[in-house]
């Protein structure tokens, strides 16, 4: 907690520098002097102070790199990590190297003991332990190079069961986040008037709550699905394809979720069963499903006439794969559908990877904030930013694997001994053999 208080007084570009692309933070010389003066010591790097550097780094990362309702949520007095790709809480997982304790101090919740890691392995070396390796996903093509290089696996693209009728519209680009959000709300209002179901995808809990506030202020009835209310996922998704439904969701709704147009009769019937306290009546559910099937079928036909589910993304993700997963919620099994991404030049992705280039473009365009930007240069910058992130993340994974290869040789020896011990009828004989070897 002492370091959390010290770090609060430190200023960016004075006491520390941030590399936003790599999500790293480093104290400057002035920053080191500031910490030394606050602690009343002469040298932060003395052997007796080695833990201080560890605490400082963790607290700086907690302050500058990790954001509440983006990277984690605070629930029941605990810090819960949110998976950036799935939008779900990683139950039982904690950050290492003192970072979790730094976040607990930052959010003023009970600081728990640091976990002790007894064994670890990279995903790559873990998967390589299987003799036969295969997998299925709807978004493997964008990662084809990595599958070949790391796992020596080819990617085979299987045609869809029915032709895709979804229309993927060109990105709508705006100068500021405020202008983008206003355009998003206007689009939702227009679609909602017709009754077309809308799925609005956001990149974080914080963003989903901000959009929800705006929709509430405009009187738009909607549901919100994020890591804070994940227990309601089945009920919310069951209603997401119905006439007039507006669903605001994080990546939770962008992966492996089947949104049925007109609604899901089984799940809706179960909700009625719970509401009417009929859980002990085995006949109720079947009769309710049968009753709802006709209603859902009629509603589905109306939704199809309106163009199916409209998927609206409020920001491009670091990975094209995640964007494709969100688009894929619409136009399933040959149904019509539509998707569009709304982008601001202030979005995290653009700021981190194309900041200077975008600033140069904007100075040339001199457009008002609320005007939509239709420039090929901007579109190319967005594509370039995503390609940069994917390339950087791939390089990070390759480097992690290189370091783990050294440990992997030792790991294989240890696990070989472990297997021998577990399978041996006589441990004494094994110990004697090892004793002789030594």
Identify the function of each model-found stretch.
Residues 384-438:
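C-terminal accessory/connector segments of nucleic-acid motor ATPases
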Residues 175-178, 372, 401:
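Charge-dense, low-complexity intrinsically disordered segments
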Residues 1-366, 415-416, 433, 437:
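Conserved P-loop NTPase motor core
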Residues 29, 178, 182, 376-379, ...:
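Alpha-helix N-cap/helix-start motif at coil-to-helix transitions, marked by capping-box chemistry
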